[in-house]
UniProtKB/Swiss-Prot annotation:
Keyword DNA damage (UniProt): yes
EC numbers on record: 3.1.21.10
Any single biological process term in GO: DNA recombination
UniProt-recorded name of the protein: Crossover junction endodeoxyribonuclease RuvC
Function: The RuvA-RuvB-RuvC complex processes Holliday junction (HJ) DNA during genetic recombination and DNA repair. Endonuclease that resolves HJ intermediates. Cleaves cruciform DNA by making single-stranded nicks across the HJ at symmetrical positions within the homologous arms, yielding a 5'-phosphate and a 3'-hydroxyl group; requires a central core of homology in the junction. The consensus cleavage sequence is 5'-(A/T)TT(C/G)-3'. Cleavage occurs on the 3'-side of the TT dinucleotide at the point of strand exchange.
Oligomer status and interactors: Homodimer which binds Holliday junction (HJ) DNA. The HJ becomes 2-fold symmetrical on binding to RuvC with unstacked arms; it has a different conformation from HJ DNA in complex with RuvA. In the full resolvosome a probable DNA-RuvA(4)-RuvB(12)-RuvC(2) complex forms which resolves the HJ.
Active site: 11, 71, 143
Binding locations of Mg(2+) 1: 11, 143
Pfam entry (one): RuvC
Entry's cofactor comment: Binds 2 Mg(2+) ion per subunit.
Taxonomic path: Bacteria, Pseudomonadati, Pseudomonadota, Alphaproteobacteria, Hyphomicrobiales
């Protein structure tokens, strides 16, 4: 009998950080919950990061995932925005790590490949595949959908991640 593993996927962002919780047992996936943690754009950066931290900490505390997956960020032309996104991503990695969860990271094209079969695709393709893979899925907005896709990517890759860690250790 396969163990059920609960995974939280996190799509970091300073304005909106998406989160999605799934359970995986063998090859089956089950939707648990999803949503978005927001920060107040009128507040200073430190306060906004605290809002993201507190919101994600509540999600991890409430849903008690076993593992976490966070999307890697990309560098864009706006260096200041990239740095702020990196800080939000730090919070997205810190919260589950402080809760004792192993945290894996995935590039955006790896997430798309795991969900839609190719490394480049549209948001609508991700939404459609989420509904096919988990018929009871519910998400409001792209951030929550992306977070669920990140969790699915981790579910597909977690065995190979464990193998790499064992070989490296």
């Amino acid at each position: 009998m396969q163990n059920t593993i609960r995974i939280v996927g996190i799509d970091p962002g300073l304005r909106r950080t998406g989160w999605g919780i799934i359970e995986t047992s063998g090859n089956s996936l089950r939707f648990v919950a999803s949503g978005t943690v927001t920060s107040d754009g009128d507040m200073d950066l430190a306060s906004r990061l605290c809002q993201l931290h507190d919101g994600l900490a509540e999600i991890v505390h409430s849903y008690k995932p076993d593992e976490a997956a966070v999307e890697q960020t990309f560098v864009n032309k706006d260096a200041v925005a990239t740095l702020k996104l990196g800080q939000a991503r730090g919070i997205a990695m810190l919260v589950p790590a402080r809760a004792g969860l192993p945290v894996s990271e995935y590039a955006p094209n790896a997430v798309k490949k795991a969900v839609i079969g190719v490394g480049h695709g549209e948001k609508q393709q991700i939404h459609m595949m989420l509904k096919i893979l988990m018929p009871k899925v519910e998400f409001k907005g792209n951030d929550a959908a992306d977070a669920l896709a990140i969790a699915i990517c981790h579910a597909h890759n977690r065995g190979s991640n464990r193998m790499r860690q064992a070989l490296a250790g």
